[in-house]
Swiss-Prot record:
Residues 878-920 are annotated as: Interaction with PLK1. It comes from Xenopus laevis (African clawed frog). Residues 222-248, 957-995 form a coiled coil. Phosphorylated. Phosphorylation at Ser-864, Ser-895 and Thr-906 occurs during checkpoint activation and requires the ATR kinase. Phosphorylation at Ser-864 within CKB motif 1 and Ser-895 within CKB motif 2 promotes interaction with the catalytic domain of chek1 and subsequent activation of the kinase. Phosphorylation at Thr-906 creates a binding site for the Polo-box domain of the plk1/plx1 kinase, which subsequently phosphorylates Ser-934. Residues 149-158, 171-190 have a biased composition (Basic residues). This is Claspin. Interacts with both chek1 and plk1/plx1 when phosphorylated. Belongs to the claspin family. It is found in: Nucleus.
Length: 1285
């Protein structure tokens, strides 16, 4: 029983109180302790690492009463005094107890159950088990008390004896005074301890509103204690203890070891268990009410982080050692505390946390263990169970005195873990070896009072932690600071203090990179340039000489270009913007010029003036948009060239040089003859119906045209439109089908149509010489340009090359690429060829041979329709191949006729006839639509006549006579032009609007008769033109001959083909030469069809008929013939051995008058006679007739295929009988020798030999891939090839 007494006296250590863990049997989770500091948590981990301590955990056998009222506490103090007094009377047991006390014990305060409320924790005590000798009766009474102290539990207590009551009353006055003092001090210290410990809740979190939990539990506990009448319970307990006081002390150890064997105690334990369950139920109900109540709990609000916090590196500890040592180290914890301060500040803002201060939650890690203990609990709180016996007063006094001494010695003898911090459950190893000295009760009380006063006077150490320097932190982390870094090599290595060798390639790469990235245009400073010039000097003799001279020129400083392009491609974009702006300016200027010309053209009054003006504006807008698309790519090409140059000015100088090197050529160009589809939009479209007459003066150009051309040249130089792309897009004609040949004047005597003014152009400027339709002139309708964009394959017309002001069109349309530079004979079109046809030599006034070759290279490619990429618009683009070709080849290509120079004059008439015949079938509108020329008045032609001869001219020969002849011809043309001018102007004005509308029409308009002229047209002098138009419509005799020959040949070929097929059908079997379709066409016959059904014969060659495209009459005749043939074959089957005379009569019906047929009949008759005689001589067994077999008299021996559908029924029945399965036979009979045969089938076997059966099987089942022919054909073959052998 002594062990029980020792456990009942519990020494309350202040740190144990602050961190007591209550074990709860319920699932509420209450009792989990919250640490105010993370150091305490880590300390718990480190406690387990120490080897000096052995954690002994004993489940307490006692349940302590809640100290709620004053009466309870008075009763406890009285029992305490009785124990002290009784202890002093029993001094004979000192030796036994001192021996028991001298055993060293390591005690950890027992972890109590959570049956009691939180207030029970405040009075919980951990004790050092040091007890004096106690009589056996006292131990028995204490043992019984341990199990009966619980409120609501002990219902089976014995009645109290009268002696016990008297003793209690007698000792009341003695105990009262000292115990009241102890009670007050205990209350004060328990309050201080309660403030220092962390509050517990049922979820393991810090319950800051402690009143909510404590008050609820305490109120329920108070009410329960009032109901159960605590005073009555205490009286029962005391009576029970007194009844057992007389038992012997000798049985102390036995009772201590076997205290669970007594039946009385078992009954009391049953009652205690019931009380414990009732406390559990009450506690769980309390926890349920608390859980269901609405509490505003402050949740953890993390500090909002900025984006910079996420990119910061985590601070890594710069120390040695593994990670666990860093985590356990004391110096590593302040950084974690600093992180938690903001969160605690947030929690402090909530008003429910006001009474929980930060100092209460934190304990300074540097505060010594003794001071912390003294500051929190100054006195030893000795709490015993409520029921005490009177006889224990003396022994209890000795116990208290021994405990005080042992407690004072404990701080000197115990091993304290983590001296600089207080963490977790602090386990103190106490060795009680001091001798037991009994002291009177007054001494004990005085010592307790003095200890309380001293501990209250001791000042609390400040909680602020002094800042440590980096060196101290490193020392605390275990870094050896005595080692200093040095520049020394390790073992086996060396330190190279020399500078590394420079990497030349890397440096060059950096320089190159910097050169490209940091390139700056250097401003050109003032400098001197030597300019080579040529001066004329007159000598003393009066002769002029050319002398070369050098003139120094001082170039001024150039300002650097301010626009420094930083981005790639920026310069190109800027150039594009500049180009577009220049194009807008140029289009606006040209629009103004066209408007002025239009007004001048329509001054003499046109009926539909306003309407025509609107249409013109629309067409101009569309034409401009299309011209922009045509010009723009050329600009891009030049911009790429400009990127390679330093400045844009250099581009202009290069173009100036190119243009300066090439002399200017004046080529008189053919002009188009106006049809209904030609364009009469503007004044300069001066294609006239009277141009067929050689009357107009050649080689004239107006001042207005010169002005336009001169104003256009610098812009074109600036924008550099000399690209092949623009040449193709602007000069390739759009296909405008308008097959109309109305009122076209063609004079057969004149092969070429003369023009009043030849086009003046430069060859290097050739590609940019057309804006929308060969722009030296104004653009025409939008159809010309817009169709270039979406026409998939436009026909390349070389006539666009020369589209100029007053151009001439050659009607030799035999070749699509007919050149307008050349006439029908293939020579350059310069004037008329009547007198100079014998002299065909090219002469240029001041052009050397190289320049001529360069120009002819372009002309050769353009006229022949070969638009290659080498055509870049400059004269140097294509020089390699064409220089080697002779001029004759050029002329032949351009004219489209490969003739020699000697035959040129003799072929004029045939060429004109060809021209007339092909002009009917060809389309003229393409060439006419793209050639726009300016209409010149008579005065303007006369004014500019003199200026035109100042330019270079293409002359037919070098002789002066040819020049004189050409001048005479031009004068004649002038006179003729004056006569016809008035008439042509009237015709032109009246046809303008109609021609413009026709351009927008398509080919379908011809079907509706829209090509017929309206009745209100001008009909004056139309008879002459209509007659000539009628003549033009007629083809030539040669063409008529060709057409008739073609038709005749087609008819005769069809007839021959039909006749040939007829003979093939008659005399050849299907396998012979004329198998038009696939040679192995299988024709299947169905089972139950008639044997005479030959439906497939009638349409066997239908595919061939469709391919050949024969007419219906031929099909009808062939169908009739096939019917006759079928009937004939059917009759032959009925009479297989009929006379040959019948067949001969049938053959005579067809082609009796043919000698070939007569000969064939004789030969076949002889051959058949021989074969019949041989067949009759050979004895033959007539086999079973195949009902499916068709006897064809004209077929080869029958081809047997592997199809079972073509077999007769008898063969199929035999095959079915042979293929019957034997059920008794083994399944894998491939390599099986013996086979069971049913006897019934042996009897049914016929007398036919087996060889015949095998033969039939072999015949019936041939290889499906090959044909097997019978050795003896059953059908008479009448193939003609057998007879001809």
């Amino acid at each position: 029983m002594a062990a029980l007494c020792e456990e009942e006296q519990v020494f309350l250590e202040p740190e144990d109180i602050s961190l007591k863990i209550v074990e709860t049997d319920s699932d509420s989770g209450q009792g989990s302790c919250e640490m105010a500091d993370q150091n305490k948590l880590l300390g718990c981990v480190e406690d387990k690492d120490t080897d000096d301590e052995i954690l002994v955990r004993k489940k307490s056998k006692k349940k302590e009463v809640l100290v709620d009222s004053d009466s309870d506490e008075e009763l406890e103090m009285r029992n305490f005094a009785d124990n002290v007094k009784g202890h002093s009377d029993n001094e004979e047991n000192e030796e036994t107890m001192s021996a028991y006390r001298e055993k060293p014990r390591k005690i950890r305060s027992a972890v109590l159950d959570s049956d009691n409320s939180d207030h029970e924790l405040d009075v919980q005590i951990s004790t050092s088990q040091n007890a004096a000798e106690i009589p056996e009766s006292e131990h028995d009474s204490l043992e019984k008390e341990t199990h009966t102290v619980k409120p609501k539990t002990s219902k089976s207590l014995k009645k109290q004896t009268d002696t016990n009551k008297e003793e209690i009353v007698k000792n009341k006055s003695k105990r009262k005074i000292p115990k009241e003092k102890i009670k007050r001090r205990t209350k004060q210290k328990s309050k201080a301890v309660a403030e220092a410990r962390p509050n517990l809740n049922d979820s393991g979190c810090l319950l800051t509103d402690g009143d909510l939990f404590d008050n609820g539990v305490e109120n329920e506990m108070d009410s329960n204690e009032e109901e159960d009448s605590l005073e009555a319970i205490r009286a029962k307990m005391k009576s029970k203890l007194n009844s057992h006081s007389a038992e012997n002390f000798e049985d102390f150890e036995l009772d201590t070891e076997g205290n669970q064997e007594s039946p009385e105690k078992r009954k009391e334990r049953k009652a205690a268990r019931l009380g414990k369950e009732a406390m559990k139920q009450m506690h769980s109900e309390t926890q349920r009410l608390i859980r269901e109540s609405s509490v505003s709990l402050p949740y953890h609000l993390p500090e909002p982080k900025t984006i910079h916090d996420f990119f910061k590196r985590r601070p890594r500890p710069l120390c040695q050692g593994n990670a666990m040592q860093l985590i356990k180290s004391t110096k590593y914890q302040p950084c974690t505390e600093e992180k938690k301060k903001p969160n605690e500040e947030i929690c402090a803002e909530v008003p429910e946390f006001d009474y929980v201060s930060k100092e209460d939650l934190e304990i300074s890690p540097e505060q010594p263990l003794l001071n912390t203990q003294c500051s929190h609990a100054a006195v030893l709180c000795v709490v015993q169970n409520d029921a005490r016996t009177e006889g224990l007063s003396k022994s209890t006094e000795a116990v208290v005195t021994g405990q005080m001494n042992d407690h004072e010695d404990a701080f000197s003898d115990s091993n304290i873990v983590h001296e600089q911090e207080t963490v977790g459950l602090i386990t103190v190893t106490e060795t009680f070896q001091t001798p037991f000295i009994p002291q009177p009760e007054s001494v004990v009380c005085e010592q307790i009072q003095n200890d309380v006063v001293e501990m209250q006077r001791m000042p609390e150490q400040p909680t602020h932690k002094p800042k440590l320097s980096k060196l101290e932190k490193l020392k605390a982390l275990g870094v050896d600071l005595s080692i200093k870094p040095r520049l020394c090599p390790d073992d086996g290595s060396f330190v190279n203090l020399d500078e590394p060798k420079p990497n030349k390639e890397f440096e060059a790469l950096k320089e190159r990179f910097l050169k490209h990235t940091l390139q700056k245009s250097k401003p050109r400073t003032e400098r001197k340039v030597n300019l080579n010039i040529i001066r004329k000097e007159t000598t003393a003799d009066g002769k002029e000489e050319l002398k070369a001279d050098v003139v120094p020129i001082v170039m001024a400083t150039e300002k650097p270009d301010k626009s420094i392009y930083q981005k790639p491609g920026e310069k190109l974009q800027v150039l594009k913007v500049k180009l577009q702006e220049a194009m807008k300016i140029r289009r606006s200027e040209e629009r103004l010029k066209r408007q002025a010309l239009y007004k001048l053209d329509n001054e003499d009054g046109f009926e539909d003036d306003e309407e025509e003006e609107e249409m013109t504006e629309e067409s101009e807008d569309d034409g401009d948009g299309n011209a922009e698309t045509a010009d723009y790519p050329g600009g891009e090409d030049e911009e790429e060239v400009g990127d390679a140059e330093d400045d844009n000015d250099e581009d202009d100088t290069v173009n100036d040089r190119l243009l300066g090197n090439v002399p200017e050529i004046v080529i008189p160009l053919p002009r188009p003859v106006t049809t209904d589809s030609s364009l009469m939009l503007f004044k300069d479209n001066s294609s006239k119906l009277g141009d067929s007459l050689p009357d107009e003066s050649g080689c004239k150009r107006s001042s207005r045209l010169e002005y336009e051309e001169d104003s256009l040249l610098p812009q074109l130089k600036e924008n550099s439109h000399n690209s092949s792309f623009e040449l193709i897009s602007s000069m390739i004609p759009s296909y405008q089908p308008c097959n109309k040949t109305t009122r076209v004047v063609i004079n057969s005597n004149n092969l070429g149509f003369r023009s009043p003014s030849p086009v003046h152009f430069k060859t290097s400027f050739l590609s940019s010489a057309s804006k929308s339709s060969g722009k030296m002139s104004e653009p025409s309708l939008p159809v010309e340009d817009s169709q270039d964009l979406y026409n998939a394959s436009p026909e390349p017309k070389a006539s666009y090359l020369c589209a100029g002001r007053n151009s001439q069109f050659q009607f030799s349309l035999e070749d699509d690429t007919q050149s307008q530079l050349l006439d029908a004979d293939g020579f350059l079109n310069v004037g008329r060829h009547k007198s100079s046809s014998a002299k065909h030599r090219l002469a240029l006034d001041t052009m050397d041979e190289n320049a001529m070759d360069a120009n002819m290279d372009e002309l050769l490619d353009l006229c022949s329709g070969q638009f290659k990429e080498s055509l870049s618009g400059t004269s140097q683009a294509a020089e390699s191949d064409a220089k080697k070709q002779p001029m004759d080849e050029l002329l032949e290509l351009c004219s489209g006729k490969f003739v020699s120079q000697a035959d040129c004059s003799t072929q004029d008439s045939s060429a004109s006839a060809k021209d007339r015949s092909t002009a009917v079938k060809k389309d003229i509108s393409d060439e006419v639509a793209t050639v726009s020329s300016s209409f010149l008045t008579e005065r303007e032609q006369e004014e500019d006549e003199e200026e035109e001869f100042g330019e270079f001219k293409l002359l037919p020969c070098d002789d002066s006579e040819s020049e004189n002849e050409e001048q005479n011809e031009e004068e004649e043309e002038e006179e003729d032009a004056k006569d016809d001018e008035d008439e042509e102007e009237i015709l032109q004005k009246q046809q303008k609007r109609k021609l413009r509308l026709n351009d927008f029409m398509e080919d379908e308009a011809e079907l509706s008769g829209s090509d017929v002229g309206s009745g209100d047209e001008y009909e004056g002098d139309d008879d002459e033109y209509e007659e000539e138009a009628i003549d033009e419509d007629l083809p030539s005799d040669e063409e008529l001959q060709d057409q008739v020959n073609k038709i005749h040949m087609k008819v005769t070929m069809d007839e021959d083909q039909r006749q040939l097929r007829f003979y093939q059908e008659r005399y050849l079997a299907d396998g012979d030469l004329h198998s038009d379709g696939p040679g192995r066409t299988r024709k299947f016959r169905w089972k139950h069809l008639d044997d005479a059904s030959q439906v497939d014969m009638f349409r066997r060659d239908s595919e061939l008929e469709e391919v050949d495209g024969e007419n219906e009459e031929t099909e009808e005749t062939e169908l009739k013939w096939r019917k006759e043939r079928f009937e004939r074959e059917q009759w032959l089957r009925e009479q297989p051995q009929g006379s040959r005379d019948n067949n001969e009569e049938e053959e005579e019906d067809i082609g009796e008058d043919s000698q070939f047929m007569k000969l064939a009949k004789k030969v076949t008759a002889k051959a058949l006679q021989r074969k019949v005689s041989t067949e009759t001589n050979e004895p033959k067994k007539p086999g079973p007739r195949n009902p499916y077999e068709v006897i064809r008299p004209f077929s080869l021996p029958k081809l047997r295929t592997g199809s079972l559908l073509s077999k007769p029924k008898e063969v199929l029945q035999k095959l079915a009988a042979v293929s019957d399965l034997n059920p008794n036979a083994p399944r894998n009979s491939r390599n099986f020798v013996f086979q069971t045969v049913s006897p019934g089938k042996k009897e049914e076997t016929t007398d036919k030999p087996r060889s015949k059966v095998r033969k039939n099987i072999a015949v019936a089942m041939p290889s499906p891939k090959r044909f097997k022919r019978d050795s003896t054909p059953t059908v008479k073959s009448r193939s003609i090839f057998q007879l001809l052998e």
